[in-house]
Regions:
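Membrane-embedded alpha-helical segments of inner-membrane proteins
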Residues: 1-179
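Long, charged amphipathic helices and adjacent flexible linkers at domain junctions
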Residues: 182-190
Length: 190
C-alpha cells in the first residue's frame, strides 16, 4: 500500500508542477517582461526567450506531464492489482480516485494558481522550465518534437498587438482609473 501511495503522490506532484508552469508561461505578457527587464530581474531574460519560442517550453512541460501521467498510471495500477488482487473492485476504485485526483489536484487547481499568481511565479517558472528543457535538449528529443510542431504550427505563436487591441486596452485602463484625468482624451484614430 505504501508504494501505491508513493507512486500516486509522485505522479500528481510532477503533474501539478507542470500545470503551474504551463499556466504561468501562457499568462506572462510582453508588457510584464518589459517591466521586469527595467527592474533588472535576472530571470526575465530566460522567460523572454521562452515566450519568444514558446514551443520548446511547452514541449518540455507536456512531455514530462505525459510521462508522469502514463508512468504513474502504470505503477499505481500495477500496485493496486498487487494490493487488492485481480478480481475485486479495488483496482477500479483506485483508478477512479486517481482520475479525480489527477483532474482536480494536478490540472484544475495548479492551472488556476498559475493563471492567478503568474506575476509572482515568473522567477520559479523561468528556473523550472530551464531545468526541464535541459535534458530534452541534450538528448535530441526537443529538436525532434520541435520539428514536428513546426510542420503543424509554422510560427503560429507570434505575439503582436493590433490597433483594436491597443485601443480596447487603453479604454479599459481609463475605465478602471489607471490614468489621471490629464492623461485621458487622446485621439487614437491614427
Amino acid at each position: 500500500m505504501t508504494l501505491l501511495i508513493i507512486y500516486a503522490v509522485l505522479s500528481i506532484i510532477i503533474s501539478f508542477i507542470c500545470s503551474i508552469l504551463e499556466a504561468v508561461l501562457l499568462s506572462v505578457t510582453p508588457t510584464f517582461i518589459r517591466v521586469k527587464k527595467k527592474e533588472k530581474k535576472a530571470y526575465v531574460t530566460h522567460l523572454e526567450h521562452m515566450k519568444k519560442d514558446v514551443d520548446k517550453p511547452l514541449i518540455a512541460i507536456l512531455t514530462l506531464n505525459t510521462v508522469a501521467h502514463t508512468v504513474g498510471a502504470i505503477l499505481v495500477g500495477s500496485e493496486a492489482e498487487h494490493v487488492f488482487g485481480n478480481g475485486g473492485n479495488g483496482v477500479f476504485i483506485v483508478s477512479a480516485i486517481m482520475t479525480v485526483l489527477i483532474l482536480v489536484v494536478s490540472e484544475i487547481i495548479p492551472k488556476t494558481i498559475g493563471a492567478t499568481y503568474w506575476k509572482k511565479l515568473g522567477s520559479f517558472t523561468a528556473i523550472g522550465l530551464k531545468l526541464m528543457i535541459f535534458p530534452l535538449r541534450y538528448t535530441g528529443i526537443l529538436w525532434i518534437l520541435t520539428q514536428v510542431t513546426k510542420l503543424i504550427g509554422k510560427s503560429a505563436h507570434v505575439s503582436t498587438m493590433s490597433r483594436e487591441e491597443f485601443i480596447a486596452l487603453t479604454d479599459a485602463a481609463e475605465q478602471e482609473g489607471v490614468f489621471d484625468d490629464n492623461e485621458t482624451g487622446y485621439d487614437l484614430s491614427f
